[in-house]
């Protein structure tokens, strides 16, 4: 499924295609990023649970052009500095994601 879609999206000359490793709908089996890369000619961004080392490896191998860090950024406002320092990451509290108020937005510890 992702291969077919990625190939068809080439015609639209998108700025990038953002794919997630997780398959919530059970439609794609196996490695989504490799299939997308084989069929999509533009910039490919991956996401979903990457560690810094996995992101580096995927980019170095040409599998992805960039990796997005969603949940990791929510829990680590200083994520780039933590990655650079190889520091431990804060555990995210999913009960505070996208909720009103400051809890979960301004109270995570920084280095």
Indicate residue ranges for each PLM-predicted region.
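Flavin-dependent oxidoreductase catalytic cores
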Residues: 1-111
């Amino acid at each position: 499924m992702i291969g077919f879609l990625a190939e068809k999206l080439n015609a639209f000359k998108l700025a990038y295609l953002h794919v997630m490793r997780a398959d919530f709908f059970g439609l794609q089996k196996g490695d989504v990023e490799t299939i997308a890369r084989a069929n999509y000619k533009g910039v490919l961004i991956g996401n979903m649970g990457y560690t810094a080392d996995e992101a580096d490896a995927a980019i170095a191998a040409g599998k992805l052009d960039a990796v997005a860090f969603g949940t990791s950024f929510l829990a680590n406002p200083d994520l780039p500095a933590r990655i650079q320092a190889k520091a431990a990451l804060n555990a995210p509290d999913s009960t505070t994601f996208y909720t009103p108020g400051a809890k979960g937005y301004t109270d995570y510890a920084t280095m």
